[in-house]
């Protein structure tokens, strides 16, 4: 499991974004969405690009058992499998 609540919330937000076929998930969009949600729930006002890239790396890996099929095409991140979710 993630080492802290903020990481778990970011994973959930990233998963929601990548699961949404109508959203073009660039790094900037993921940063914006994570910052917005975390500021609402946790009072965190900024999430760095490095943090999001590291989260994506962790979600792709088997380190925490996610092994998510995340692909990037021209800077847009998505799941390679339609309807995929790490929480569903």
Q: Language-model segments: which ranges?
A:
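Short, basic/aromatic recognition patches that contact phosphate-bearing ligands
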Residues: 1-88
